[in-house]
From Swiss-Prot:
KW Cytoplasm (keyword) present: yes
Keyword Methyltransferase: no
Cellular localisation: Cytoplasm
Cross-referenced HAMAP family: SmpB
Functional description taken from the UniProt entry: Required for rescue of stalled ribosomes mediated by trans-translation. Binds to transfer-messenger RNA (tmRNA), required for stable association of tmRNA with ribosomes. tmRNA and SmpB together mimic tRNA shape, replacing the anticodon stem-loop with SmpB. tmRNA is encoded by the ssrA gene; the 2 termini fold to resemble tRNA(Ala) and it encodes a 'tag peptide', a short internal open reading frame. During trans-translation Ala-aminoacylated tmRNA acts like a tRNA, entering the A-site of stalled ribosomes, displacing the stalled mRNA.
GO cellular component: cytosol
Molecular-function GO terms, alphabetical: RNA binding
InterPro entries reported for this sequence: SmpB, SsrA-bd_prot, SsrA-bd_prot_CS
Pfam families according to UniProt: SmpB
Designated name of the protein: SsrA-binding protein
Membership in a protein family: Belongs to the SmpB family.
């Protein structure tokens, strides 16, 4: 008897919308996070902000800086809860080597894109990115405005019919 394919639900905790506006995302990877217990509890309440976070490669390990996980009020007082501590990303050695090659290119960086639950574990989607120029951002805004206007007119035409 064949096994049924289980649906994997991606429960998103936090987005970094600004990253896709500021950077061209060339490739995305899924990385695990090394967290403490109080951080997991805070993530269950979505008390996290990855808007100003960034990823750095240091001594063949990858770390997440600047992610703010607010501690819950019910966290015990004997635990030192630092909301902006550095968190290690869990990746294979092969993936780290690929990232290292990409980062050595001029203008390349790693950006945290999305934080989500998968099978009870917290995962971070990171993107290998290059910065956009201001004219690229203007072009994206024009395209987005045009798409919005197109949808609006189609909706009006369909409403009249």
């Amino acid at each position: 008897m064949a096994k049924k394919n289980k649906k994997i639900s991606l429960n998103t905790i936090a987005f970094n919308k600004k990253a896709r506006h500021v950077y061209f995302i060339e490739q995305t990877l899924e990385a695990g996070l090394s967290l403490e217990g109080w951080e997991v509890k805070s993530l269950r309440d979505s008390k996290v902000q990855i808007k100003e976070s960034y990823v750095i490669l240091r001594s063949n390990e990858i770390f997440l800086y600047g992610a703010h996980i607010s501690p819950l009020k019910s966290v015990s007082t004997h635990v030192n809860s630092d909301p902006i501590r550095t968190r290690k990303l869990l990746l294979n050695r092969l993936e780290i080597n690929r990232i290292k090659e990409k980062i050595n290119q001029k203008g390349a960086t790693i950006v945290a894109l999305k934080l989500y639950w998968i099978r009870g574990m917290v995962k971070l989607e990171i993107g290998l990115a290059k910065g956009k120029k201001s004219y690229d951002k203007r072009q994206d805004n024009k395209l987005r405005d045009w798409q919005r206007d197109k949808q609006r007119t189609l909706k009006q035409i369909n409403y009249r019919l």
